[in-house]
Swiss-Prot record:
This is Cell cycle control protein 50A. GO terms for molecular function: aminophospholipid flippase activity; structural molecule activity. It is found in: Membrane; Golgi apparatus; Cytoplasmic vesicle, Secretory vesicle membrane; Apical cell membrane. Residues 71-292 are exoplasmic loop. Its main location: membrane. The gene is Tmem30a. It is a multi-pass membrane protein. Component of various P4-ATPase flippase complexes which consists of a catalytic alpha subunit and an accessory beta subunit. Interacts with ATP8A1 to form a flippase complex; this complex forms an intermediate phosphoenzyme. Interacts with ATP8A2 to form a flippase complex. TP8B1:TMEM30A and ATP8B2:TMEM30A flippase complexes have been shown to form intermediate phosphoenzymes in vitro. Interacts with alpha subunits ATP8A1, ATP8B1, ATP8B2, ATP8B4, ATP10A, ATP10B, ATP10D, ATP11A, ATP11B and ATP11C. Residues 49-315 are annotated as: Interaction with ATP8A2. N-glycosylated. Contains high mannose-type oligosaccharides. Keywords: Acetylation, Cell membrane, Cell projection, Cytoplasmic vesicle, Disulfide bond, Glycoprotein, Golgi apparatus, Lipid transport, Membrane, Transmembrane, Transmembrane helix, Transport.
Length: 328
């Protein structure tokens, strides 16, 4: 059911101006738009229209949520390409001042922003009378532990075999090729950044982040790019390395004993945080993350429960003398 209203049902009225000229007035024109007499349509929500909506939402969302949740939990570790993540807990990257503490123009290679960073980067804008590159709290707090994975092939030969960890291909394509660029010019990166200084908490300048690959230095370093994409929740994981499967005959990580070598550079005790390393594969919906499935199941269950409650109320009071139907 719906109520309809039309401006045609009302006759425009009101005094007209004096003959021979237009009278000066601050009153709006006597039109349907300015006098708020446009046609309107307003739905009347009744049990007959609302209850099916709640049940339909519940019947759609609950199966979708169950499917996503089961798919997420069924991701089998160590099959196919394996993704290595580092995880942090109790780290609030979604804080407003933290999120804004960056200069996107500087990160995009703008020479003027390189030497004169945005004031949003304060108090990590300048140090030792030099501009900080990259500036801001996000860059200053970049994760810098080093993780190395080794396989002990057999107990008789305990010499560990290092697992090849790929550094390239861990950042989003749009970030790598659009949002982050080094300053233009043919000079070396060290020359381009000579008038800047490193962030306060960094052990080395931005042009020396990857000593093994010169093309992975500066603002286009993929570890740096991954860190600069802030997380929405205080417990999060970020992609660290990729372990590629070489062929279909051999598993990516064969059965055996492994050990993880960690070069500890990133303290977490001062914010009561925790660090972890995750090895995982991906499915059609990405990596293991049960949140989306739980959200769908929760919304679907609430909608279905509300539908049942309203159905009971409608059945109990539909014969009431006050109304023949419940209007919501």
């Amino acid at each position: 059911m719906a109520m309809n209203y039309s401006a045609k049902d009302e006759v425009d009225g009101g005094p007209t101006g004096p003959p021979g000229g237009a009278a000066k007035t601050r009153r709006p024109d006597n039109t349907a738009f300015k006098q708020q007499r446009l046609p309107a349509w307003q739905p009347i929500l009744t049990a007959g229209t609302v209850l099916p909506t709640f049940f339909i939402i519940g019947l759609i969302f609950i199966p979708i949520g169950i499917g996503i949740f089961v798919t997420s939990n069924n991701i089998r570790e160590i099959e196919g390409n394996v993704f290595m993540y580092y995880g942090l807990s109790n780290f609030y990257q979604n804080h407003r001042r933290y999120v804004k503490s960056r200069d996107d123009s500087q990160l995009n290679g703008d020479p003027s922003a390189l030497l004169n960073p945005s004031k949003e980067c304060e108090p990590y804008r300048r140090n030792e009378d030099k501009p900080i590159a990259p500036c801001g709290a996000i860059a200053n707090s970049m994760f810098n532990d080093t993780l190395e994975l080794f396989l002990v092939a057999n107990e008789s030969d305990p010499k560990p075999v290092p697992i090849l960890l790929k550094k390239k291909g861990i950042a989003w394509w749009t970030d790598k090729n659009v949002k982050f660029r080094n300053p233009p010019g043919k000079d070396s990166l060290q020359e381009k950044f000579k008038d800047t200084t490193k962030p306060v908490n960094w052990h080395k300048p931005v042009y020396e982040l990857d000593p093994d690959d010169e093309s992975n230095n500066g603002f286009i370093n993929e570890d740096f790019i991954v860190w600069m994409r802030t997380a929405a929740l205080p417990t999060f994981r970020k992609l660290y390395r990729l372990i590629e499967r070489t062929d279909d005959l051999h598993p990516t990580l064969p059965a055996g004993q492994y050990y993880l070598n960690i070069t500890y550079n990133y303290p977490v005790h001062f914010f009561d945080g925790r660090k972890r390393m995750i090895l995982s594969t991906i499915s059609w919906m990405g990596g293991k993350n049960p949140f989306l499935g739980i959200a769908y199941i929760t919304i679907g269950s609430i909608s279905f429960l509300l539908g049942v409650v309203l159905l009971v109320i409608n059945h109990k009071y539909r014969n009431s003398s006050n109304t023949a139907d419940i209007t919501i």
